[in-house]
From Swiss-Prot:
Annotated protein name in UniProt: Dolichyl-diphosphooligosaccharide--protein glycosyltransferase subunit stt3
Regions that span the bilayer: 22-42, 126-144, 147-164, 176-195, 198-212, 218-234, 240-265, 274-293, 303-323, 363-385, 392-408, 413-434, 483-503
Keyword Manganese: yes
Lumenal domain ranges by topology: 43-125, 165-175, 213-217, 266-273, 324-362, 409-412, 504-752
Gene Ontology cellular-component terms listed: endoplasmic reticulum; oligosaccharyltransferase complex
Catalysed conversion reaction: a di-trans,poly-cis-dolichyl diphosphooligosaccharide + L-asparaginyl-[protein] = N(4)-(oligosaccharide-(1->4)-N-acetyl-beta-D-glucosaminyl-(1->4)-N-acetyl-beta-D-glucosaminyl)-L-asparaginyl-[protein] + a di-trans,poly-cis-dolichyl diphosphate + H(+)
Residues spanned by motif DK motif: 617-624
Motif (DXD motif 1): 53-55
Primary role: Catalytic subunit of the oligosaccharyl transferase (OST) complex that catalyzes the initial transfer of a defined glycan (Glc(3)Man(9)GlcNAc(2) in eukaryotes) from the lipid carrier dolichol-pyrophosphate to an asparagine residue within an Asn-X-Ser/Thr consensus motif in nascent polypeptide chains, the first step in protein N-glycosylation. N-glycosylation occurs cotranslationally and the complex associates with the Sec61 complex at the channel-forming translocon complex that mediates protein translocation across the endoplasmic reticulum (ER).
Domain notes: Despite low primary sequence conservation between eukaryotic catalytic subunits and bacterial and archaeal single subunit OSTs (ssOST), structural comparison revealed several common motifs at spatially equivalent positions, like the DXD motif 1 on the external loop 1 and the DXD motif 2 on the external loop 2 involved in binding of the metal ion cofactor and the carboxamide group of the acceptor asparagine, the conserved Glu residue of the TIXE/SVSE motif on the external loop 5 involved in catalysis, as well as the WWDYG and the DK/MI motifs in the globular domain that define the binding pocket for the +2 Ser/Thr of the acceptor sequon.
EC number: 2.4.99.18
Gene field: stt3
Length: 752
């Protein structure tokens, strides 16, 4: 009676727990979402509401066109102010999801009589979506283990620096909403596979369509889900639920994605989409085989069917290779192919290799972005192997692919972070479950019930019951062990929170257009040279001014200065970029015809030698040389820019080719004026300034910012008398020297 009363009371406690667990989970999720949003607002508080980096400036400019001119004009937008004189079909060559999302939010807020600027919507979009990402991660992780695991994963995802780096306020890039859609699509996919519901499969397809509109990384989902299905088929786990989920997702998702202008017919004509199509066909064969298998019981017929299936799969593979070799199916693009052949971009497409985000990461950068979670990834994967349900197989595949791609390209730590957070949550929740339960009282009750049950059994049955009763919970009952493990885990979690907050605040919340440095007294000094230069361009040059710069700054010039650019961050035309690189690396007399041919009015360069800014153009110079050498190997030779010892020198030991190049002259022209005589120093390259000031003949300095970071040079017009500009410059300098010459005391002035 006592045992039954205890069990009844425990049931009452459990039912009471269910009543308060749901609102508690909702409250915790709200707190996680608020923490996710607030931790990304450092840049707005410390600086102001401003767009960061480079690509976001184009997205912001496109969003303004969308809300000002409407969706139809946005889709048909031809940008004549970029890639001069070619222009760019912007509306058909971008992923519109980010801009459409901002536009809808902007319109809804105005309908609600909330007057906001489109810039503020763009700045705060990424933090807002980070809260939704945490909730989506919760729903995905809870399918693996429990609600506690989901809450841990959501908390990790909300503040992990690997995700924060692309979702702080002002980071208005495609990834701002793409990771949210990635996790939401995966969560719905697992839901569809477990339920076998065509509704959830359709929802997965619609979210996949949203993802396609938002980010080129949708190809990761395109290949991830088919790979999951393929592995399940190899494991012999074909079910009608799997068939319904994938076919519904694939048909709706593919047809919807083909409505995006930039994607078009790629889902049925490019190599990176063929795995999804192949698995779709394979599922139809499996469905047909299982249908026939249920109708016919003959062994020989089943063998024949299996043979036919193998032949069909082999034939499909041969046809795929044949279509790929003939060009009917487009091959992998350079950016995707470089994920498999890591040296491909460096050898064949240096423009891809020149982007710092496309370099492989270091161990320190992985720890910087994921802290102790990276060590828990293999633990979580191991625990998934122990259960190995369909959803666990998905996370295992995700972990393997995410780790590989992150190891190839540091930018893809963004796609690795979600699975690391989930795997770490599985590991920690399992650890805490082991050391925080089961309760000792519960175990005593179960032992008493088992002993009472065994008393009723006699002889051999009592012995067998001892060996077969495997329902006893295994836990850690030592209080010291529990306290040590739980306290150490809590310590690591607290340190993770401190680390994430520090990294977000100090490393990822500084806009690229505004720099800051700490002075000797501990105060912050802000360096606003970029906006100073762009503001000067906007105020002091005509609207149709053509500005040449390296492609990194094209979007910023168009967004802040509103001037015409030759190249920008879209990098769709390698020849045009190589032409700019050739002009920068050629001697002045050879660069001038290129400048005149492209109607260049001003040249913008970044020189970091004064401040010690290492991301200036002289440190990017080798990439300009390599890209232009790919098209003009006889005119531009990289070896000529290195000393006989193989050193990259910019001081007096620099090679003649280096000293005569246009970029070198523009960078070091007048730089010695900021230092005492013979003490000039290049802080970015840790070398002395050249002792002889480079002289310019075809261009002249127009503006240099206060910290000597951004420099603008005006291209001279041809001489009206047809004289060589070098001779004209030397002649003018000679006249100035004559005018400055002091008059002799015994010299009699001429009478006029």
């Amino acid at each position: 009676m006592a045992n039954s009363a205890t069990i009844t009371s425990k049931k009452g406690v459990k039912s009471h727990q269910k009543d308060w667990k749901i609102p508690l989970k909702v409250l915790i999720l709200i707190c996680i979402a608020v923490a996710s949003v607030s931790s990304r607002l450092f840049s707005v508080i410390r600086y102001e509401s401003i767009i960061h980096e480079f690509d976001p400036w184009f997205n912001f400019r496109a969003s303004k066109i969308l809300v000002e001119q409407g969706f139809y004009n946005f889709l048909n937008w031809f940008d004549e102010r970029s890639w001069y004189p070619l222009g760019r079909v912007a509306g058909g060559t971008l992923y519109p999801g980010l801009m459409v999302t901002s536009g809808i939010i902007f319109k809804v807020l105005h309908l609600l009589r909330i007057n906001v600027n489109i810039r503020d919507v763009c700045v705060l979009l990424a933090p807002a979506f980070s809260g939704i990402t945490a909730i989506a991660t919760y729903y995905l992780a809870r399918e693996l283990k429990s609600d506690a695991c989901g809450l841990l994963a959501a908390a990790f995802m909300g503040i992990a620096p690997g995700y924060t780096s692309r979702s702080v306020a002002g980071s208005y890039d495609n990834e701002a909403i793409a990771i949210t859609l990635l996790m939401s699509t995966f969560a719905l996919w697992i839901k569809a596979v477990k339920s076998g519901s065509s509704f959830w499969g359709a929802c997965t397809g619609l979210l996949y369509f949203y993802m396609v509109t938002a980010w080129g990384g949708y190809v990761f989902i395109t290949n991830m889900i088919p790979l999951h299905v393929f592995v399940l088929l190899l494991m012999g786990r074909y079910t009608s639920k799997l068939y319904i989920a994938y076919t519904t997702y694939y048909v709706i998702g593919t047809l919807a994605s083909m409505q995006v202008p930039f994607v078009g017919f790629q889902p049925v004509s490019t190599s990176e989409h063929m795995s999804a199509l192949g698995v779709f066909g394979l599922l139809q064969l499996f469905a047909f085989y299982n249908y026939v298998k249920g109708l016919v019981s003959s062994k020989q017929f089943q063998i024949l069917i299996r043979f036919a299936l193998v032949c069909l799969v082999g034939l499909a593979t041969v046809v795929l290779f044949a279509l790929s070799s003939t060009g009917v199916i487009a091959p992998w693009t350079g950016r995707f192919y470089s994920l498999w052949d890591t040296n491909y971009a460096k050898i064949h497409i240096p423009i891809i290799a020149s982007v710092s985000e496309h370099q492989p990461p270091t161990w320190s950068s992985l720890f910087f972005d994921l802290q102790f979670l990276i060590w828990l990834l293999p633990v979580g994967v191991y625990l998934c192997f122990k259960e190995l349900r369909n959803e666990h197989v998905f996370i295992i595949i995700y972990s393997v692919l995410g780790t590989y791609f992150c190891g190839v390209m540091v930018r893809l730590v963004l796609t690795l972070t979600p699975c690391v957070c989930i795997a770490a949550a599985v590991a920690i929740s399992t650890l805490l479950d082991t050391y925080m339960g089961p309760e000792v009282e519960e175990d005593k009750v179960s032992e008493e019930a088992a002993s009472a049950k065994s008393k009723n059994k006699k002889g051999i049955f009592s012995i067998l019951s001892f060996f077969t009763s495997g329902s006893k919970n295994i836990g850690i009952y030592s209080l010291l062990s529990r306290v040590l493990v739980i306290s150490s885990t809590a310590y690591f979690l607290i340190m993770f929170v401190y680390h994430s907050s520090w990294v977000t605040s100090n490393a990822y919340s500084s806009p690229t257009v505004v720099l800051s440095t700490v002075l000797n007294d501990g105060s912050l000094m802000y360096i606003d040279d970029f906006r100073e230069a762009y503001d000067w361009l906007r105020r002091n040059t005509p609207y149709d001014t053509k500005v040449m710069s390296w492609w990194d700054y094209g979007y910023q010039i168009a967004g802040m200065a509103d001037r015409i650019t030759l190249v920008d961050n879209n990098t769709w035309n390698n020849t045009h970029i190589a032409t700019v690189g050739k002009a920068m690396s050629s001697p002045e007399e050879k660069a001038y015809p290129i400048l005149r041919k492209h109607d260049v009015d001003y040249i913008l360069i970044i020189y970091g030698g004064t401040l010690g800014y290492s991301s200036d153009d002289m440190n990017k110079f080798l990439w300009m040389i390599r890209i232009s050498q790919g098209l003009w190997p006889d005119e531009i030779v990289e070896r000529n820019f290195f000393t006989p010892n193989g050193e990259y020198r910019t001081d007096d030991a620099a090679t003649p080719t280096m000293r005569e190049s246009l970029l070198y002259k523009m960078s070091y022209h007048g730089a010695w004026k900021l230092f005492p005589p013979n003490q000039g120093y290049d802080r970015a390259r840790n070398q002395k300034l050249p002792s002889k000031d480079p002289q310019l003949f075809t261009i002249e300095e127009a503006f240099t910012t206060v910290h000597h970071l951004v420099r603008l040079y005006k291209v001279k017009k041809p001489d009206t008398l047809g004289r060589d500009l070098k001779q004209v410059t030397l002649f003018e300098e000679g006249k100035r020297k004559k005018l400055r010459r002091p008059a002799k005391t015994n010299e009699i002035p001429l009478r006029v």
